[in-house]
Amino acid sequence: MKRTVDFSMFRCPLCDSSMDAASGKSLICTERGHTFDLSRHGYVNFLTKPVKTSYGAELFEARSRLIGECGFFDPLHDAIAELISHPKSGHEAFTILDSGCGEGSHLNALCGFDYAGKAAIGTGIDLSKDGILKASKAFKDLMWAVADVARAPFHDRQFDVVLSIFSPSNYAEFHRLLKNDGMLIKVVPRSDYLIELRQFLYTDSPRRTYSNTAAVERFTANAAHSRPVRLRYVKTLDQQAIHWLLKMTPLAWSAPKDRVSLLKEMKSADITVDVDILIGMK
């Protein structure tokens, strides 16, 4: 089912004016006529020029398979859904923005939960056109946009929940976009996140270890009433899932090729997911 989009939520990322839908093919700002294409697949491209990213179609395909078919992040989705299980919105539905949504698998999963009888209306933005294209084709009941979180194309106080899952954050924009009493949820890796890959791929490198101290401190400094929730679990992946994980994670991109090849030959592997779910309230 394809959702009817409320274009009134958008504002021009160039001049901050409201947007009008023009014949279903583009959005035009009401002040200066800035025009942004509306894809036939239903997403809006708010970038004025292409942006090169390291995240392409193959990565997003692997990530969607690992999340959708293997349930690699199911416990994470369960934990986040529990945190937002009682949205403060007084309406029958509440709004979620996934900032840095990639191909949309996290947002789609989270919008499928029962939130005390309230429906979750999801919107995802990402700099990668490949990711948003895949999201818009796969999840037609959600809204997608190619956009920069530093100039998010939405009016103030549009969302009950803002998500940032393994993605960069712009806290000034997050604060602007959240409704009063809104919730900010950021997921950052902990030291044991994918620790098996770190230790196998890097025998003598700083990448064998990781600390999220700086990311947690930035969140705490920018989010009111913040608190962390730690989540740690282990998933057993078969050989195909290992291949998807290696395509998905930047840990493998700069690793020695011989170590990557050896990992690909494994029939199965236990992989640790260790994260902090950081919660802040507006």
UniProtKB/Swiss-Prot annotation:
Transferase is among the record's keywords: yes
Recorded GO terms, molecular function? Answer: metal ion binding; methyltransferase activity
Identify the EC number(s): 2.1.1.-
Keywords from the UniProt entry? Metal-binding, Methyltransferase, S-adenosyl-L-methionine, Transferase, Zinc
Residues annotated as binding Zn(2+): C12, C15, C29, H34
Q: Which InterPro entries match?
A: 23S_rRNA_MeTrnsfrase_RlmA (IPR052939), Methyltransf_25 (IPR041698), RlmA_N (IPR048647), rRNA_m1G-MeTrfase_A_prd (IPR016718), SAM-dependent_MTases_sf (IPR029063)
Pfam families hit by this protein: Methyltransf_25, Zn_ribbon_RlmA
State if Zinc is listed as a keyword: yes
Swiss-Prot/TrEMBL GO biological process terms: methylation
So what family is this one in? Belongs to the methyltransferase superfamily. RlmA family.
Q: What is this protein called?
A: Putative 23S rRNA (guanine-N(1)-)-methyltransferase YxjB
Q: Which organism is it from?
A: Bacillus subtilis (strain 168)
